[in-house]
């Protein structure tokens, strides 16, 4: 979102605001304080529909899921009226929606007030919010090629996912400098493992189990997430070439750029950041998330020979399959180069600029101010 805002600011003196749910409020305010403290961050009450891929209807009727869903349905109604009053007061020329449950009440309020909607869908499988709002949208940007979506072609454009400018290909010399900066041996290969901001317990446990195998061939940097950091710290001793960190607050692009191979979940933005880096990647998708969107994200790149996939089912049978796959790739310069080159074909360095153009074009077509 910040990348798109940055491009919008280049085109004129626009009044920009960012709306999010309460859970993301503190993080959003911190991000926008660094980017532009004049952009207000407003909080919208919202609720989500808990759906688990591959689970039965009976599973979803369990009180631990049913009651929170009913409660959050009420939150959506509250968020709708909250959004309605805020929009009646502000009357923006266009609303840019990035998906997620907080966008649903905002989108329906905008529809009622006839305020144009522009959507962006990062995942190869459209989320429920975007599927519900897409009939009302004036334009839609997608993170993956259009063949993975059912959006009307006259509305949709494949723009990619806006990523920060520091995600770009690095030279071998630059990567060695980054390894040295991070405290690793510049002459050894480096494996970076990340499960996203909250970490990924299944990936963490697999890496701990195969740590010795990996360290015999490469340096290893595990970004565990805050929840499991202390537990993993107790399970592992200090070793040359081993680094454990809960979270990378600044410089994630440099960490990923330094890596010779990255192991990650299938979050859409993370994958496009790695594509922008032309980074050889092994994806371990979370198969239980809503709609199976991580499985579908991963398949896009697997089909293009741009990444390798290891399923959680495979890990459950034998963690060593991950070690064999990582080491096998590291030992083949041809495979490393092939994966990086193929992944790089998905990079869209102008995604933020293209998305900003779509937003401004929508405003002009609706006869609103330029």
Residue spans of the language-model regions?
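Glycosyltransferases and closely related glycan-assembly transferases
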Residues: 33-36, 81-96, 104-118, 131, ...
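Conserved nucleotide-sugar phosphate-binding/catalytic loop shared by glycosyltransferases and other
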Residues: 10-73, 159, 228, 311
